[in-house]
């Protein structure tokens, strides 16, 4: 299962765990993803998206219709 936000495109980032003794081991920083259903009034249906916390705030600010229109212009299938 892909760990990518469908709205913002956020992906896992890589970095280091750093111990108290400054020993470094590689790790992944995963995005804060949640599967969420949104009701789209214009299409009269539910849309299920995998979104990050920032993606949820964008949907709150812009509205689900605007976000879906932007996703469709990028060529993403919804």
UniProtKB/Swiss-Prot annotation:
One GO molecular-function entry: structural constituent of ribosome
Matching InterPro entries: Ribosomal_bL28, Ribosomal_bL28/bL31-like_sf, Ribosomal_bL28_bact-type, Ribosomal_bL28_sf
Region: Disordered, residue numbers: 1-24
GO cellular component, one term: cytosolic large ribosomal subunit
Keyword Acetylation among UniProt keywords: no
GO biological process: translation
Keywords from the UniProt entry: Ribonucleoprotein, Ribosomal protein
Pfam families noted in UniProt: Ribosomal_L28 (PF00830)
Family, similarity comment: Belongs to the bacterial ribosomal protein bL28 family.
Name of protein: Large ribosomal subunit protein bL28
